[in-house]
A protein has these predicted regions:
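Membrane-interface extramembranous regions
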Residues: 1-157
Length: 157
């Protein structure tokens, strides 16, 4: 059982840290996509999705990832906290703000993308690749399941 707990903790923690880092390096294209969809739907404060919610989510992922990897914090806070980013991802993928099928990234050489990223607004469909798929949703759902199992196993002792 110890090997299973360690394996789950390493998988969940590593995934959270890797994806948390992308929120600060510009590699996460999902938040600009959410902002664009939220603006189109008339959601108040849509401009906060990128970069504010992007950075808050990245920070949560980094903290949860670190806490789930550290043995002294894993059981008390790390494993339960690690569920939240994945739950949020699944909820957003099931909402009209994101959807299950999403673009696979930024379009290469997208006109105005750098200016839009620097301004934090003004995203357009041409900024994202035409290739779409459910990969991010499947990853979010799979890691939600793994993080819930991890939290349950650590709660049981």
């Amino acid at each position: 059982m110890t090997i299973l707990k360690w394996g789950l903790s390493l998988a969940v923690g590593g995934f959270l840290i890797i994806f948390g880092v992308t929120k600060f390096t510009g590699g996460a294209h999902i938040f600009p996509l959410i902002e664009m969809n939220a603006t189109d739907l008339g959601v108040p404060f849509a401009g906060l999705f990128f970069p504010v919610v992007n950075y808050v989510t990245g920070l949560l992922e980094l903290v949860a990832g670190a806490l789930v990897l550290l043995p002294m914090t894993r059981k008390s806070i790390g494993a339960p906290l690690a569920v939240l980013p994945f739950l949020g991802a699944v909820v957003f993928h099931l909402s009209p703000l994101l959807g299950v099928v999403t673009p696979n990234g930024y379009a290469e050489g997208a006109d105005g993308l750098d200016a839009a990223l620097q301004a934090g607004s003004g995203f357009e469909p041409s900024h994202f690749t035409a290739e779409t798929g459910p990969v991010l949703f499947i990853l979010a759902a799979a890691f939600l399941l793994l993080s819930v199992i991890n939290a349950y196993l650590h709660k049981q002792g």
